[in-house]
Amino acid sequence: MVLSVLFVTITIKAEEKKLKHLRHFVCFKYKNNISEDKITEIEKDFIKLEKKIDDIKGFEKGLNNSPEGLNKGFKHCYLITFDSKEGRDRYLVHSDHKKFSELVGPVVEDVFVVDYWATK
């Protein structure tokens, strides 16, 4: 009986761990003089990080379309998914992420980042 309860508990904990994802939400406010072609080029480089950095488990991008008008000029949004805090931390110091940061730095007016554990 005790072994059955222990097995069920371990199984539930393993399932819970699989469902947890660390989300790294990034918004860019590009400078006004940056062309859409340049933004597209930068986004392609950002997306390539998913193939270069094993810790990235998912990458999504999109444009703000909220009718509320509360985006404070942030239009380009990116959601990067990690399985662990350690994976996110490795991403932050990864040489390819550093190179991308150097590329995007001169063309953005501001950056907004929020990390959170996704739960259901």
Where are these regions (language model features)?
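Surface-exposed, polar helix/loop patches in the mature regions of secreted/periplasmic/lumenal proteins
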Residues: 77-120
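Short S/T/G/P-rich N-terminal loop/turn motif that feeds into the first structured element of a domain
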Residues: 7-74, 83-90, 116-120
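Bacterial N-terminal signal peptides
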Residues: 1-7
